[in-house]
């Protein structure tokens, strides 16, 4: 399929860089939520034209993207201000023992006419991982909030039309509590949703946690984000959650992710991990690298 010269702007998903798609004269590519694409996918779309200008946008760049941007040949622009009338999000890492307080907060938000996200890392119970799953939490929420709120369930195993129906019902406030996996991480805009509860939060990375938190930063109401872990989280997991709790600066979170996970490969496909420098360290010598760049 050839995109003719009569078409000036094409908006789409991964389909835009499939093998059989050709462009008459591709000049600029804008990749929103760029961290969601793989290394090969980014190369594919850029190779659809000659000397293509490439603008990549992300609330939290993954380690490799940030490293190439900061220490490579990419110019960086940072937008640090929120849209007009947006309130700062209140983020809290909550011990499992204090879960009742979070549930009381949810009841209060429901009483005020607002909606809630509840996110889990798994769809169903796992024999390997002892963490929250959407199916069980959905049943628990239906029972706990019976007569108070309508609870919905959405995850990646549902058919596209089923997911669309559920999201439309949530958008119309026919569903007040939406239990979900990370499928709601991007592309969801429900202004009336003001609280997100992330269960098994230690199973999510920094970028995903920040993106999930962004689901409730859509209106002029005060948004809330709660992280609750499974039993016995590691010290590294707690440190990661407290870092997200402490700041809403996506670039600062990306830098934290870069220093702790490593940048991956500049000329390979690994998007995190050690670069195996012989003498330098991206974590310890970042100031020197900035001067050299």
Predicted feature locations:
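Short, small-residue-biased leader/transition segments that mark boundaries at the very start
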Residues: 1-3
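Loop/turn-to-beta-strand initiation segments
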Residues: 6-9, 25-27, 50-55, 65, ...
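Hydrophobic residues in beta-strands of the RecA-like P-loop NTPase core, especially within AAA+ ATPase
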Residues: 12, 30-31, 180, 198
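SF2 helicase catalytic motif II
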Residues: 15-56
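Catalytic P-loop NTPase motifs of RecA-like helicase/translocase cores
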Residues: 17-19, 37-38, 63-64, 126, ...
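N-terminal cationic and glycine-rich segments that engage phosphates or anionic surfaces
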Residues: 28, 42-45, 56, 65-69, ...
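Conserved interdomain linker/interface between the two RecA-like ATPase lobes of SF2 helicase motors
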Residues: 73-135
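C-terminal helicase module of SF1/SF2 nucleic-acid helicases/translocases
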Residues: 99-115, 135, 139-293
């Amino acid at each position: 399929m050839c995109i003719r010269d009569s078409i000036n702007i094409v908006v789409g998903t991964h389909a835009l860089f499939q093998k059989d798609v050709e462009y008459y004269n591709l000049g600029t590519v804008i990749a929103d939520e760029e961290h969601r694409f793989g290394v090969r996918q980014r190369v594919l779309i850029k190779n659809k034209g000659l000397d293509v200008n490439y603008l990549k946008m992300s609330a939290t760049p993954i380690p490799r993207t940030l490293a190439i941007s900061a220490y490579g040949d990419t110019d960086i622009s940072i937008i640090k201000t929120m849209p007009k009338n947006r309130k700062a999000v209140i983020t809290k890492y909550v011990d499992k023992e204090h879960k009742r307080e979070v549930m009381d907060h949810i009841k209060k938000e429901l009483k005020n006419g607002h909606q809630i996200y509840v996110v889990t890392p798994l769809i169903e119970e796992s024999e390997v991982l002892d963490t929250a799953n959407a199916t069980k939490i959905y049943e628990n929420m239906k029972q706990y909030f019976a007569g108070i709120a309508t609870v919905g369930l959405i995850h990646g195993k549902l058919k596209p039309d089923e997911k669309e129906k559920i999201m439309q019902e949530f958008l119309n406030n026919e569903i007040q509590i939406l239990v979900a996996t990370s499928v709601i991480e991007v592309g969801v805009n429900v202004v009336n949703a003001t609280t997100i509860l992330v269960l098994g939060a230690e199973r999510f990375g920094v970028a995903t946690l920040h993106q999930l938190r962004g689901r409730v930063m859509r209106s002029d109401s005060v948004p809330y984000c709660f992280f609750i872990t499974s039993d016995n989280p590691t010290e590294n997991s707690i440190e990661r959650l407290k870092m997200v709790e402490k700041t809403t600066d996506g670039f600062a979170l990306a830098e934290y992710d870069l220093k702790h996970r490593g940048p991956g490969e500049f000329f390979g496909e690994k998007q995190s991990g050690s670069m195996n420098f012989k003498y330098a360290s991206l974590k310890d010598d970042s100031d020197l690298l900035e001067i050299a760049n």
